Amino acid sequence: MKFLFDLFPIILFFAAFKLWGIFTATAVAIAATLAQVAWVAFRHRKVDTMLWVSLGVIVVFGGATLVLHDEKFIQWKPTVLYWLFAVGLVAARYAFGKNLIEKMMGKQLTLPEPVWDKLNLAWAAFFAALGVTNLYVVRNFTESQWVNFKLFGTTGAIIVFVILQSLWLAKYLKGE
């Protein structure tokens, strides 16, 4: 259910794009992300840092898209967000000694420290690669193809990555 909730702004962006175009879709994505943060704050009294970062990036890049009437800003937004996540994971681990993946998943999984480190680096590399892939699609495909990639390609890549990660982690979870 959380996965669908996380996709909420992307799905609305996709639908609005198909109906009204990139600028309305951008406004819808900003509003949907604001609503998402408000709902989480109301329901849980605490909003995860990743969601705050997502809100900040969509407001800045979406706002620039709307104010300057230039779709390139919203197209760059996923790359900037993914790269911020990648840098955040690496910086938290090596500059501050905190493994954010372990912090997010540590209550559900018991893993040796080196495995947590590999998992953290794998997610950082994955986010970095998603950012590069987004740029490639922005530069080499149409706006409509980019929107399709944003929903289906990125979501598919995340699902495949999580499945592969689960298969890799299975050998460490035999006793659980």
From Swiss-Prot:
Localization annotation = Cell inner membrane
State where it is primarily located.
membrane
- UniProt keywords, alphabetically: Cell inner membrane, Cell membrane, Membrane, Transmembrane, Transmembrane helix
Question: What Pfam families does its record include?
Answer: IspA (PF04279)
Superkingdom classification of source: Bacteria
What the entry lists under InterPro entries is as follows: YciB
Membrane-crossing residue ranges in chain numbering: 3-23, 49-69, 72-92, 118-138, 149-169
Choose one Gene Ontology CC annotation of this protein and give it. Answer: plasma membrane
Membrane topology label: Multi-pass membrane protein
HAMAP family listed in its UniProt record: YciB
Tell me which family the UniProt entry assigns to this protein: Belongs to the YciB family.
Q: What does this protein do?
A: Plays a role in cell envelope biogenesis, maintenance of cell envelope integrity and membrane homeostasis.
Q: What is this protein called?
A: Inner membrane-spanning protein YciB
